[in-house]
């Protein structure tokens, strides 16, 4: 607990920022435009997904369910966090004046962790689903129902929410961050802050790493099967190419947007001497770095829907006409059937 000589809640740290500086940093027009573009992009992706899910194969349908959960998560994340940030930027209200008990700050901290970690976990889940579908087609049910796919999405959401609630249970703290328009985990040296910061950064980093590993194996397997099969043994492969292209795009976007923030959090909480003073102050350079990395991470919510929109078969065929003329292909089942017969 930082001494502040007042009845304010524990989410307030000593700050030294003027109103004029806040006006220069917190532009309501930029924040509003960012949110509008992001919300419109995700709505467009959801409408395209709704049409794509009709008449698709069972395998592709389950993948599209996970993708729908990802886009829905990004949409709700922009909607909830954007409403708070844009309101603060427009009114430039003092957080301690409207939220002395830190209820709004805790709520925003939870949703920031939830909507930050959920896309990373969903990306790893989608990579796992495609990995099993490509390399172990007989080790899972032939048909993954939409109900089961949505149940998996629900479990991912529950795991992300459970992590976000930990500071409310005593592990870590949510505090108002520079320039006073948002709340996030505390980059302090106390054991709870360090543990929560490392837990968040490690889970996010492991999700990205797992996605990279599984996607690499899946792509290598697809390439091996494509070059090793005869045309007579093949069946349509365009959907496999489409799903892997989308999955690789999602992984690349998540890596570029989130890894800098995750690495920065881990480095800051482990820094010796501590980055945060005993009074709760961070250097202005550290606060500005955190804000920059956070803004980079939020681009993930805008770019995710465009990965799906641009990496559809209709677009890929324009970039690579061979996709629309090549023979039917890419099933691992003929090879596996032959191997079973030989054994």
From Swiss-Prot:
<feature type="transmembrane region" description="Helical; Name=3">
    <location>
        <begin position="107"/>
        <end position="128"/>
    </location>
</feature>
<dbReference type="GO" id="GO:0004960">
    <property type="term" value="F:thromboxane receptor activity"/>
</dbReference>
<keyword id="KW-0807">Transducer</keyword>
<feature type="transmembrane region" description="Helical; Name=1">
    <location>
        <begin position="30"/>
        <end position="52"/>
    </location>
</feature>
<keyword id="KW-1003">Cell membrane</keyword>
<keyword id="KW-0297">G-protein coupled receptor</keyword>
<feature type="transmembrane region" description="Helical; Name=4">
    <location>
        <begin position="150"/>
        <end position="172"/>
    </location>
</feature>
<feature type="transmembrane region" description="Helical; Name=7">
    <location>
        <begin position="290"/>
        <end position="311"/>
    </location>
</feature>
<feature type="topological domain" description="Extracellular">
    <location>
        <begin position="1"/>
        <end position="29"/>
    </location>
</feature>
<feature type="topological domain" description="Cytoplasmic">
    <location>
        <begin position="312"/>
        <end position="343"/>
    </location>
</feature>
<feature type="topological domain" description="Cytoplasmic">
    <location>
        <begin position="53"/>
        <end position="66"/>
    </location>
</feature>
<feature type="topological domain" description="Extracellular">
    <location>
        <begin position="271"/>
        <end position="289"/>
    </location>
</feature>
<feature type="modified residue" description="Phosphoserine">
    <location>
        <position position="331"/>
    </location>
</feature>
<feature type="topological domain" description="Extracellular">
    <location>
        <begin position="173"/>
        <end position="193"/>
    </location>
</feature>
<keyword id="KW-0675">Receptor</keyword>
<keyword id="KW-1133">Transmembrane helix</keyword>
<dbReference type="GO" id="GO:0006954">
    <property type="term" value="P:inflammatory response"/>
</dbReference>
<feature type="glycosylation site" description="N-linked (GlcNAc...) asparagine">
    <location>
        <position position="4"/>
    </location>
</feature>
<dbReference type="GO" id="GO:0005886">
    <property type="term" value="C:plasma membrane"/>
</dbReference>
<keyword id="KW-1015">Disulfide bond</keyword>
<keyword id="KW-0325">Glycoprotein</keyword>
<feature type="transmembrane region" description="Helical; Name=5">
    <location>
        <begin position="194"/>
        <end position="219"/>
    </location>
</feature>
<feature type="transmembrane region" description="Helical; Name=6">
    <location>
        <begin position="247"/>
        <end position="270"/>
    </location>
</feature>
<keyword id="KW-0472">Membrane</keyword>
<protein>
    <recommendedName>
        <fullName>Thromboxane A2 receptor</fullName>
    </recommendedName>
</protein>
<feature type="modified residue" description="Phosphoserine">
    <location>
        <position position="329"/>
    </location>
</feature>
<keyword id="KW-0812">Transmembrane</keyword>
<feature type="transmembrane region" description="Helical; Name=2">
    <location>
        <begin position="67"/>
        <end position="87"/>
    </location>
</feature>
<dbReference type="GO" id="GO:0007204">
    <property type="term" value="P:positive regulation of cytosolic calcium ion concentration"/>
</dbReference>
<comment type="similarity">
    <text>Belongs to the G-protein coupled receptor 1 family.</text>
</comment>
<dbReference type="GO" id="GO:0045907">
    <property type="term" value="P:positive regulation of vasoconstriction"/>
</dbReference>
<comment type="subunit">
    <text>Interacts with RPGRIP1L. Interacts with RACK1; the interaction regulates TBXA2R cell surface expression.</text>
</comment>
<dbReference type="InterPro" id="IPR001105">
    <property type="entry name" value="Thbox_rcpt"/>
</dbReference>
<dbReference type="GO" id="GO:0045777">
    <property type="term" value="P:positive regulation of blood pressure"/>
</dbReference>
<dbReference type="GO" id="GO:0007189">
    <property type="term" value="P:adenylate cyclase-activating G protein-coupled receptor signaling pathway"/>
</dbReference>
<feature type="topological domain" description="Extracellular">
    <location>
        <begin position="88"/>
        <end position="106"/>
    </location>
</feature>
<feature type="topological domain" description="Cytoplasmic">
    <location>
        <begin position="220"/>
        <end position="246"/>
    </location>
</feature>
<feature type="disulfide bond">
    <location>
        <begin position="105"/>
        <end position="183"/>
    </location>
</feature>
<dbReference type="InterPro" id="IPR017452">
    <property type="entry name" value="GPCR_Rhodpsn_7TM"/>
</dbReference>
<feature type="glycosylation site" description="N-linked (GlcNAc...) asparagine">
    <location>
        <position position="16"/>
    </location>
</feature>
<keyword id="KW-0597">Phosphoprotein</keyword>
<dbReference type="InterPro" id="IPR000276">
    <property type="entry name" value="GPCR_Rhodpsn"/>
</dbReference>
